[in-house]
Amino acid sequence: MPQLSRYSDEHVEQLLSDLLSVLEKHKAPTDLSLMVLGNMVTNLINTSVAPAQRQAIANSFTRALQSSISEDKAH
């Protein structure tokens, strides 16, 4: 998802590291991790975005997620 951001790479990487640490601490398998992260995204949209903008934000997030996934990347 390369685009200009108002957040530093360092800040983003630290948050990502912290979130991954929590998932690892709880030994969450991939399906549970995705379920929890999806619920977190839903909660953020429903509690922090105006109702009139929620669908547009969800669509934008979905497009960004899909564009960041490459089928040829090994896991």
From Swiss-Prot:
Do you know which InterPro entries this protein is assigned to?
Answer: UPF0352, YejL_sf
- Known NCBIfam families for this protein? PRK13689.1
Q: Give the protein family.
A: Belongs to the UPF0352 family.
Tell me the protein's name: UPF0352 protein YejL
Task: Please name the source species.
Answer: Salmonella arizonae (strain ATCC BAA-731 / CDC346-86 / RSK2980)
